[in-house]
């Protein structure tokens, strides 16, 4: 599958989707994107910058949602213009898709909306690549139905069916907790879609702080290493210059100054894993 100006897949190095959870300001967004670009260029990691113009799914109605669509998209367009980066952001309703698709390179669907058929169809008809997040309530094999919906809509619109990624972000485990079953990455590969692992939302504690979500960022490196060891096409991680002051999802964000070391470790592991065939292909 081609994403921007690079190819993705199990026979390629993993690509990275990374950035702040939400657009907080223009300067911080440009600075963060610039630092990530520098890191990824040094490590030769294909990179897509991500940030949200609006966080529609909030624990509390008083939580910070973002700067709004117009200002958020303007800032994301500046990331593209000033830094020459590909940009991803999430859409939350059908009416947002057209204006957002006119600015960004990749759309993302929120996990809670993965079974909304009309919404998935509309995203597929945008013509953009789409990172489809698996719901926290969904079994990994059920992602086949979601990917099939997107492919069917694309085919009916006369568009390429080879534009959809399946993203794992953990599964609900009791109240206010998520776990990551690494088998799900292999199971979702059977859809034929490139599989992405969201290493930061997977350590989220949804609603764990009452009016906001908590998180356990100390487990991000653990889960990221495990996911890369299974063989994945892409990795998703949110980061922030100062997670303690982040306006959204700070507890599970990777400190920006730790990204280089973490990514270097993951690249070494990815190269080792992909040097040899995947043994599970011969185990049935």
UniProtKB/Swiss-Prot annotation:
GO cellular component annotations of the record: cytoplasm
Keyword set includes Transferase: yes
One BP annotation, GO: keto-3-deoxy-D-manno-octulosonic acid biosynthetic process
Lineage: superkingdom: Bacteria
Top-tier EC class: transferase
Molecular function terms from GO: 3-deoxy-8-phosphooctulonate synthase activity
EC number: 2.5.1.55
Keyword Plastid attributed: no
Gene3D superfamilies, alphabetized: Aldolase class I (3.20.20.70)
Swiss-Prot/TrEMBL keywords: Cytoplasm, Lipopolysaccharide biosynthesis, Transferase
Catalysed transformations (reactions): D-arabinose 5-phosphate + phosphoenolpyruvate + H2O = 3-deoxy-alpha-D-manno-2-octulosonate-8-phosphate + phosphate
A UniProt-annotated Pfam family: DAHP_synth_1
Cellular localisation: Cytoplasm
Main localization of the protein described in the UniProt heading: cytoplasm
InterPro entries the UniProt entry points to: Aldolase_TIM (IPR013785), DAHP1/KDSA (IPR006218), KDO8P_synthase (IPR006269)
SUPFAM superfamilies according to UniProt: Aldolase
Pathway: Carbohydrate biosynthesis; 3-deoxy-D-manno-octulosonate biosynthesis; 3-deoxy-D-manno-octulosonate from D-ribulose 5-phosphate: step 2/3; Bacterial outer membrane biogenesis; lipopolysaccharide biosynthesis
HAMAP family found in the cross-reference section: KDO8P_synth
Family of this protein: Belongs to the KdsA family.
PANTHER family: PHOSPHO-2-DEHYDRO-3-DEOXYHEPTONATE ALDOLASE
Name this polypeptide is given: 2-dehydro-3-deoxyphosphooctonate aldolase
Name of the coding gene: kdsA
């Amino acid at each position: 599958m081609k994403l921007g100006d690079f190819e993705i897949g199990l026979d390629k190095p993993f690509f990275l989707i990374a950035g702040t959870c939400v657009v907080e300001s223009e300067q911080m967004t440009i600075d963060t994107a610039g630092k990530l670009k520098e890191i990824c260029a040094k490590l030769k990691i294909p990179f897509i910058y991500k940030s949200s113009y609006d966080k529609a799914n909030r624990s509390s109605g008083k939580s910070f949602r973002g700067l709004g669509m117009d200002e958020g998209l303007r800032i994301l367009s500046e990331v593209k213009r000033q830094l020459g980066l590909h940009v991803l952001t999430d859409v939350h309703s059908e009416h947002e898709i057209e204006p957002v698709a006119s600015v960004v390179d990749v759309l993302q669907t929120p996990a809670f909306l993965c079974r909304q058929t009309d919404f998935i169809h509309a995203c597929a008809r945008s013509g953009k690549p789409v990172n489809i997040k698996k719901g926290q309530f969904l079994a990994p094999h059920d992602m086949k139905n979601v990917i099939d919906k997107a492919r069917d809509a694309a085919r009916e619109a006369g568009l390429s069916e080879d534009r959809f990624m399946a993203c794992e972000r953990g599964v609900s485990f009791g109240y206010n907790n998520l776990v990551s079953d690494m088998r799900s990455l292999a199971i979702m590969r059977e859809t034929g879609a490139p599989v992405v692992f969201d290493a930061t939302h997977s350590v989220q504690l949804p609603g764990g702080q009452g009016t906001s979500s908590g998180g356990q960022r100390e487990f991000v490196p653990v889960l990221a290493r495990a996911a890369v060891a299974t063989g994945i096409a892409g990795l998703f991680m949110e980061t922030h210059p100062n997670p303690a002051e982040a306006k959204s999802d700070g507890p599970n964000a990777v400190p920006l100054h730790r990204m280089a070391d973490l990514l270097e470790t993951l690249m070494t592991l990815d190269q080792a894993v992909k040097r040899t065939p995947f043994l599970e292909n011969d185990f049935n």
